[in-house]
Structures are given as structure tokens and as C-alpha cells.
Amino acid sequence: MAIVYAVVARGTVVLAEFSAVTGNTGAVVRRILEKLSPEISDERLCFSQDRYIFHILRSDGLTFLCMANDTFGRRVPFSYLEEIHMRFMKNYGKVAHNAPAYAMNDEFSRVLHQQMEFFSSNPSVDTLNRVRGEVSEIRSVMVENIEKIMERGDRIELLVDKTATMQDSSFHFRKQSKRLRRALWMKNAKLLVLLTCLIVFLLYIIIASFCGGITLPSCRS
């Protein structure tokens, strides 16, 4: 899965969170949240560490953050964050401004996970952003090294256990293989039916030629 972690927070207060990998991602993200300026409420940011990029969307007094593989680009992760932002505000609105930590986690972590899988496996989902003309805005977001906001003593090495990611990739591979086998089986079944009909038709033509015509008059007497 290309997007492996997501969180919705108010300042440093985490309201909902989901991780598809094990490791210390949550600890690194909390350090990032601590370093974000509380005075800025609307912005897009990107910070890289190792082979991952932290994509950040700040809007409506909340922070929407996801971590994705650095080869996945920026458009789809930000499309994911826009979708999460829309769904979160629709479900909770201003309630989130006073909610305690993890108040929405039981319900919304499932949404984070479902949309994470959808956007990771459907790279074309950023089409809407292209129509909206947001591509140029996303391109203007510079990917900064995480050291830009982290002081030397604050930085935590990002440790990600890829086992979960590999298991997830294996699951998707098996799912795609099963779908492909089903499609090939259907294709072969259709071909077999067509071939059977063709053989029956040819046999009928041969029998008809020996029996005096289409109605087989010679063979009836």
C-alpha cells in the first residue's frame, strides 16, 4: 500500500489515527505536530524522511496528515487528504474543536483505512483535482527535508516494519491474481461454448447434406 499512515489532529491532540505499518511513525508524527506553527490554519506542507514523505493539509483549525512512499508523488496523497478533510468535517464539524484525544478514533480510523486502500490502489482518483485546477497548487508545495522543522536533538529516526506492508501487498496481489484467473476462466468458458456450438452446427450441415436437406427428409423415411 502506497499510503501507510494517516492522522487527524487539532494541534497536538490526535482525534483519529490509522497505521498500516508497525514502528515509531506515530512518535515521529507527534514531533512534527509539535513543530507546526499554531498561527497558520490553512496550508499544505511536505516533509521527507528516508523513503517516505509526510503530506500535511491544514484547514478549519485541524491538521490532516498522511505518510506515503516517496515514489507515489504528491497529487494522490493530497487528494486523499482532501477526501478525509471533507468526510471528517461532514461527520463532526465544529465538534472536533473541543473533542478530547481520540474521540473520533473508533469510528473514523476505519474511514482512514478504507480511503487509504482506495487511494493507494486507484492512482487515477486525482482526476477531480485536475479538473478543479489544484494540480498547479500541489506542484508548488515543496518537499522539504524533515530536518527543516526538527532541531538536531528533536529528530527521531523513522523505523517502519515493512512486514505489514508486504502482507498487504501480498493480499492485493492474491486478490488481483484471483480476479485474473476468474476472467481467464470466463473467457475460456465462452470460447468452449462457442466451439461446441460450431461443432454441432458443422455436424448438422454434414448430416443435412447426406439426408437430403435442412429438414432431413431422407433420414426420416
Swiss-Prot record:
Domain v-SNARE coiled-coil homology span(s) in chain numbering: 127-187
Family: Belongs to the synaptobrevin family.
Cytoplasmic side stretches: 2-190
Protein name: Vesicle-associated membrane protein 714
N-acetylalanine modified-residue sites: A2
GO BP annotations, alphabetical order: protein transport; response to salt stress; vesicle-mediated transport
Pfam name, any one: Synaptobrevin
SUPFAM superfamilies: SNARE fusion complex, SNARE-like
Membrane-crossing residue ranges in chain numbering: 191-211
Keyword annotations: Acetylation, Coiled coil, Golgi apparatus, Membrane, Protein transport, Transmembrane, Transmembrane helix, Transport
Annotated ranges, domain Longin: 7-112
InterPro entries (alphabetical): Longin-like_dom_sf, Longin_dom, Synaptobrevin-like, Synaptobrevin-like_transport, V_SNARE_CC
Membrane topology summary: Single-pass type IV membrane protein
Residues in the Vesicular compartment per record: 212-221
Gene: VAMP714
PANTHER family attached to this UniProt entry: SNARE PROTEINS, VESICLE-ASSOCIATED MEMBRANE PROTEIN 714
Gene3D superfamilies, per database record: 1.20.5.110, Longin domain (3.30.450.50)
Alphabetized PROSITE patterns for the sequence: LONGIN (PS50859), SYNAPTOBREVIN (PS00417), V_SNARE (PS50892)
A cellular component term, taken from the record's GO annotations: vacuole
Tissues showing expression: Highly expressed in leaves, stems and roots. Detected in flowers.
